Swiss-Prot record:
Residues 1193-1202 have a biased composition (Basic and acidic residues). Residues 1203-1212 have a biased composition (Basic residues). Residues 738-748 have a biased composition (Polar residues). GO terms for cellular component: cytosol; nucleoplasm. The keyword Protein transport does not apply. Keywords: Cytoplasm, Disease variant, Intellectual disability, Neurodegeneration. Disulfide bonds: none annotated. This is von Willebrand factor A domain-containing protein 3B. The keyword Membrane does not apply. SMART domains: VWA. It comes from Homo sapiens. It holds the Pfam family DUF4537. It is found in: Cytoplasm. It is linked to Spinocerebellar ataxia, autosomal recessive, 22: A form of spinocerebellar ataxia, a clinically and genetically heterogeneous group of cerebellar disorders due to degeneration of the cerebellum with variable involvement of the brainstem and spinal cord. SCAR22 patients manifest variable severity of intellectual disability associated with adult-onset cerebellar ataxia.
Length: 1294
């Protein structure tokens, strides 16, 4: 990381600002009396330039990349390619080139560590002492209104101590304050707000300690106290401290007249009995544009030894303590704590990434070049990747390495097909022996699977995919970028010495040069090729030597010479001076190369056979079989010599290359065996195939999505997308022009890679299958758009629109199918010329047509109609003495083909066949036949006859048949008349097939036009008869979790049916059946997505009750399991009651933030009944107190009994046991998490959870064992306890 680059040092001012973390702890109490939002503006990551983006901009610079419209793809700069270590930032997808040294990065690590520590201190400060009870006082002049109307006898001392802590820790740091108590008449401590002094604080504490319990408070007393506090014009805010609950009458009065209170009312709930008071105080704060805080104590106060603080003559002794409490149900997560926690999580994540830069610095793509090498060494200025073979190169830049293969891209947008085995009851075989029904197993498939595109996976299984427009566009851009890189590599390999010699893999090379007399006309070219080979490849190797051989072999050096500038220049000069010799002593040259023990590879350049028998040479080669021999032939027409050279190369593991003189392309594709090019071309072929498959899947997904969701979402969105696909197919379907050029050039190097697809197609057998429901629908939708539009204007009903007119949805699907047809036809047009240009003049037309004729290419009309044809036969009826045929296919297959010889019938639907594509293919074939016919006739003409015709290129034979036949007759027919007639017959057959296809299309149009008016008359004749289409029930039978109205929790169940668009009938697992809004229903089970959870995600957490019914509660993920420890599989979540829970991944369902807020707002908690038995249990085990829920209080439950006194008592079902978990130390007491393991923790704690009894008032308690979570997952928290003796702050033990 100490690599120097452009200057990236930080200014001293920035460093001083970041080092200011050390100086931020001055006067923490006074400094922190601000909101978390303002605090983060001062000390957050962004303000101190410590976000990941800001740090990366200071230690590096972003790699430039922009979209070039003319090229149609993103283009990245290459000026810094390999010079800098790079870091990929996943948030915005940008790549940064790092230029900073390690010392600078260590400074950022230190600053981030200090920031994390500062955030932890802030969170501890917010959740300790008076801030836990009262929140944070943000204003400088306040009035505290005390409402003790709902206080219990044992809570007065606790309230006094809590208020004392608030006065000493927070009020002492503001300017003015006052205290008012709610009573029959408001009781003021002072008439107006008093400046804060030590004496005023001591007086206020003394006044608070003298407060007593007042039994009755008038309904208007609370409003009068708040209005009285608001009359003081100097105060900025009113802090309304409510102990217990507020009567319903006072709630209504306060909410009605809340706007009369002139100041914001900050409400503080202390020990609220139910969620009603919490909701009321939230509404009151919201109406007065203020904040809300809530606290509920859990244990008694614990007295600590007293200590004194002396300031002058004033001595004050008091017990400092911390309440051990919690947030009450319905209070939600504290916003000020959550903001700091979020910032701390971001700081931890950024710190981890920056630390990785120091621990394992990113390696640059290209190693640095030492410019101070020896003077005799060769200066290497090119990219070392040029020395790689294609296999190594593809390991870095191939599709799999870039994660651009089809299965890699589909991994995050596909899911497995869901099926299962169910029991079907059936009638027993022998009823006399068995009367009960037999159980048969049947495989059923999930209903929702039909709404997704089916695709086979690489392991043979079936998956469903859903490709979005953004996904398809992203993949298209990335794959084009990757293919362009491969295309540049192919072009580089085809240029220069690589095209003849291939890639040079070994370090010690011998080059044997044939200088026999037969090489006279080729020697200059061979010299140029060898010199080019030296300059481009050989200079990167270690040692080399040259041997020229004719009658005898002469070496340039006795042994291999080192690669340096002097030797390379001398070798080039020696090669230029080579002269022509006599014979070809190949064996002597090979022996010279074999004699050098350092030889690793031999390149043999020759144009003919050796002087010695080939067997003798091969026997010598077998002795040194471990040394590869790369043979290069300069006489491709000598098959015997080339066979010998191929055998030598194959025997030693080398390769055979050749240069064909007199040919425009010196390397015909059928002879190329270059493995480097083969791998690259296959990779490009795979890339184009994957891109085409991705576009096809996207088209199917778009059509499928529209088909099912058009009525719900509207057609406009899908119509725009499909129309854009049809109007601009070149943007998403056609490869770019440079891709086409690469395909063409690749043909010259490797057996026409883009023509292989057609060869595969011709081998593929045509499958004849019966029509399915989908194919019938597709065939009906392929009618003319104009007829469909006119029929729709006639106002036909939905019942028969499938037969008489196309709906908007069907029309757009038809347009999409036609677009796909056009795309494939363009591919046929683009590739057709490559297929039919194989015009070997030495092959007879009869043999040529066996490969490229209409029958061989399956281009007869019956081949085209086979996909939309069904064989049919008549049945003889003796009564009628006739052969009759079924009319069941008349609607779908309007035409029939009867064979004259066998009278066999084939039913045909022309609309089901792609006749337009078929006609284009036949036209392409006819062009190739005409081209061959014209060339054959032209070659047969003499030069004199060509001059008579006044033409310098082949002319059309069929248009000038008479003139050309006369010329051939004058030449005594140098070519066979049979050959011409065969090609002419093939051309006429193709034109006949095109005419018949056009007639079939016209017949289909007429059949459709004749059928439509009859269907319309039927509709007009029966105007009252309407067929109501039955909409599918999407949720019927679906396993879900649904909200229960009694307590707001989510319970498992099964949807029985959808009552309406917004409501569904759910059968709960506890036996009840209720109508639930679909917004409170979450599907579970089957092939549901299971995304990775991150800190801060919102989830439903499953709460398992051994003797009750499981349910789900909303929660937030606050900690992830340790990946390095296999046994730790628990996520830590913060439930809606601000308590932690430990759950496995299977017990969590990810939800959105809106759903989390909605679920929290509907969770209810009725008051706790005052049961002596319960209070006794709580006194014995107060550390594990739960807040039970009850269906109704005593008064409410008695009223229905008075209204229906004679109602007959029926045996009631076991009611839903309403319970909410509580955990004093972060674990779940009274309930067991889904994945708790009692074997790991042998000492479980016992908690008492109370459920309302069925059919009566009161409570029944059940003791439930709850195993605490692993201790390592919990941080040490602080708890507050209380007693009659005093107030203390103690750390909570786990």
């Amino acid at each position: 990381m100490e690599k120097s680059g452009p200057s990236s040092t930080i200014s001293e001012q920035q460093l001083q600002r970041q080092e200011g973390w050390i100086n931020t702890k001055t006067d923490l109490a006074e400094q922190s009396l601000i909101s978390s939002e303002k605090w983060l503006q001062l000390h957050g990551l962004k303000s101190n330039k410590l976000t990941l983006k800001q740090i990366l901009s200071q230690i590096g610079f972003p790699h430039c990349e922009d979209y070039v419209a003319s090229l149609g793809r993103p283009v990245a700069s290459r000026y810094a390619d390999g010079l800098f270590p790079q870091l990929y930032r996943a948030e915005d997808g940008r790549v940064y080139n790092l230029t900073a040294k390690s010392e600078l990065i260590y400074q950022f690590v230190e600053h981030l560590t200090q920031a994390v520590e500062s955030y932890k201190q802030r969170m501890d400060w917010l959740t300790s002492k008076s801030r836990q009870i009262f929140g944070v006082i943000l204003e400088q002049c306040v009035t505290i209104v005390l409402d003790f109307g709902g206080i219990l006898e044992g809570e007065l001392d606790l309230c006094r101590e809590a208020l004392t802590m608030v006065l000493q820790e927070q009020v002492a740091h503001i300017t003015e304050f006052n205290i008012i108590r709610v009573s029959q008449e408001p009781v003021k401590w002072q008439e107006n707000a008093t400046p804060v002094t030590e004496q005023s604080i001591a007086t206020a504490i003394s006044w608070v300690e003298k407060l007593t319990v007042e039994l009755t408070v008038s309904e208007a007393g609370r409003l009068d106290a708040l209005l009285e506090a608001g009359r003081d014009k100097t105060i900025e805010s009113i802090y309304y401290f409510v102990v217990g609950d507020v009567p319903e009458e006072s709630k209504e009065l306060l909410l009605q007249r809340a706007l009369e209170i002139p100041c914001p009312v900050y409400t503080v709930s202390f020990n609220a009995r139910g969620e009603g008071t919490i909701a009321f105080l939230k509404d009151l704060s919201a109406k007065t544009h203020s904040r809300f805080h809530a606290f509920a104590e859990r244990t008694e106060c614990v007295e600590f030894p007293a200590f004194s603080t002396k300031d002058g003559d004033n001595v004050m002794t008091w017990n400092s303590r911390k309440l051990k409490g919690k947030l009450p149900p319905g209070a939600g997560v504290r916003e000020d704590v959550f903001l700091v926690w979020q910032e701390m999580e971001e700081a931890c994540s950024t710190l981890a990434q920056i630390q990785r830069l120091v621990a394992e610095p990113p390696k640059p793509d290209v190693a640095t070049v030492d410019c101070e090498s020896e003077t005799t060494s060769v200066e290497i200025a090119s990219n070392p990747e040029d020395t790689w073979d294609s296999k190594t190169w593809l390991q870095k830049y191939g599709l799999k390495a870039q994660k651009l293969s089809l299965y890699d891209v589909l991994a995050d947008c596909s899911f497995r097909h869901a099926d299962g085995v169910v029991d079907i009851k059936a009638k027993p075989e022998n009823e006399s022996v068995q009367t009960s029904a037999e159980t048969n197993k049947k495989t059923v498939h999930a209903k929702y699977c039909s709404r997704f595109v089916h695709a086979p996976w690489k392991d043979g299984s079936l998956v469903h995919v859903n490709i979005t427009k953004e996904k398809c566009k992203w993949y298209s851009e990335r794959i084009h970028t990757a293919l362009a890189r491969i295309r540049r590599r192919i072009k580089w390999l085809q240029d220069g010495s690589q095209s003849l010699f291939g890639r040079l893999h070994n370090d010690c090379i011998y080059i044997l040069i044939d200088t026999s007399h037969s090489m006279k006309s080729k020697l200059d070219l061979v010299k140029d090729k060898i010199i080019q080979f030296i300059q481009e490849q050989l200079k990167y190797k270690s040692k080399f030597n040259f041997v020229k051989f004719d009658g005898q072999a002469v070496a340039w050096r006795e042994q291999l010479a080192e690669v340096n500038e002097d030797n390379l220049e001398q070798a080039q000069s020696w090669i230029r001076d080579i002269k022509i010799g006599s014979s070809t002593n190949t064996l002597s040259a090979l022996k010279t190369a074999f004699a050098d023990k350092e030889t690793q590879a031999i390149y043999l350049l020759t144009d003919g056979r050796p002087d010695q028998p080939p067997e003798t040479v091969i026997d010598q080669v077998k002795r040194f079989q471990e040394i590869p021999i790369y043979t290069i032939s300069f006489n491709y027409n000598d098959e015997i010599a080339n066979r010998f050279l191929k055998e030598v190369a194959a025997l030693t593991g080398g390769e055979f290359h050749f240069y064909n003189f007199g040919c425009k392309d010196p390397t015909p594709p059928e002879a190329v065996q270059n493995e480097d090019l083969t791998l690259l071309v296959k990779e490009m072929e795979q890339g184009h195939s994957d891109l085409e498959k991705m576009q096809d899947l996207y088209s199917e997904s778009l059509i499928m999505d529209w088909w099912y969701n058009a009525e719900k979402d509207g057609d406009s969105k899908h119509q725009k997308e499909i129309c854009s696909m049809i109007s601009t197919p070149e943007k998403c379907a056609k490869p770019q022009s440079d891709v086409d050029s690469t395909q063409t050039s690749s043909l010259n190097m490797l057996k026409g890679p883009w023509g292989l697809s057609d060869q595969k197609v011709q081998k593929k057998k045509v499958l004849h299958a019966e029509s399915t429901k989908t194919s019938l629908l597709r065939s009906q939708m392929s009618s003319l758009r104009s007829s469909a539009c006119s029929e729709r204007k006639d106002g036909l009903s939905n019942a028969s629109s499938r037969r008489t007119a196309l709906s908007d949805k069907e029309m757009s699907i038809l347009l999409a199918e036609e677009w796909l047809d056009d795309k494939s036809s363009e591919k046929v047009t683009r590739e057709g010329s490559q297929v039919y240009d194989h015009d070997s003049s030495d092959v007879s037309s009869e043999n040529w047509l066996k490969t490229y004729g209409l029958v061989a290419k399956k281009l007869t009309l019956m081949d085209a109609l086979s996909v939309a044809a069904v064989p049919h036969s008549s049945t003889y009826v003796p009564v009628l003495d006739k052969h009759v045929v079924s009319k069941v296919f008349d609607e779908v297959f309007p035409l029939a083909h009867v064979c004259n010889d066998t009278n066999k019938m084939t039913l045909i639907n022309p609309q089901g066949a792609k006749l337009n594509i078929y006609k284009r293919k036949v036209e392409q074939a006819i062009q190739s036949y005409e081209k061959r016919l014209n060339k054959i006739v032209w070659r047969a003409l003499s030069q004199e006859e060509k001059e008579k015709l006044d033409a310098n290129k082949p002319i059309q034979y069929l248009e000038n048949k008479t003139v050309l036949n006369q010329a051939l007759e004058r030449l005594n027919w140098p070519i066979s008349l049979k050959e011409l007639s065969m090609l002419e017959s093939e051309i006429l057959a193709g034109k006949m097939y095109i005419q018949q296809a056009m007639e079939l299309q016209e017949a289909a149009k007429k059949n459709y036009a004749n059928k439509a008016p009859g269907e319309q008359q039927k509709l007009q004749g029966n105007p009252t008869k309407k067929t109501k289409s039955k909409r599918p029930d999407p949720l019927k039978g679906q396993k879900v979790i649904a909200r229960c109205d009694e307590n707001g929790f989510y319970f498992p169940g099964v949807v029985k049916k959808c009552v309406s668009r917004t409501q569904a009938l759910v059968g709960f697992s506890y036996g009840d059946t209720k109508v639930v809004s679909t917004s409170f229903i979450t599907p579970v089970g089957g092939a549901m997505p299971c995304p990775l959870l991150q800190v801060g995600d919102y989830v439903f957490a499953k709460i398992v009750i051994p003797k009750g019914f499981d349910f789900y509660v909303p929660a937030i993920v606050i900690a992830l399991p340790n990946k390095h420890v296999a046994t730790e599989k628990f996520y830590t979540v913060l439930k809606c009651n601000n308590r932690r829970e430990f759950c496995p991944r299977s017990a969590l369902i990810k939800i959105s933030q809106n759903k989390y807020a909605l679920s929290c707002s509907h969770i209810k908690s009725p008051p706790i009944p005052e049961d002596p038995e319960v209070e006794d249990v709580e006194a014995r085990n107060s550390a594990f107190l739960f807040w039970p829920l009850k269906e109704a209080d005593t008064q409410d439950s008695r009223e229905p009994r008075r209204e229906k006194p004679r109602r007959k008592k029926r045996p009631a079902k076991q009611p839903l046991q309403q319970a909410a978990p509580s955990d004093s130390d972060g674990s779940s007491h009274g309930i067991s998490s889904h994945g708790s393991c009692q074997g790991t923790h042998p000492e479980p704690r016992t908690a008492h959870l109370h459920f309302p009894a069925a059919g009566r008032l009161g409570l029944s308690s059940h003791a439930i064992i709850a195993t605490p979570p692993p201790r390592a997952a919990l941080p040490c928290t602080l708890q507050a306890t209380h007693s009659s003796k005093g107030l203390r702050s103690v750390p909570e033990t786990l």
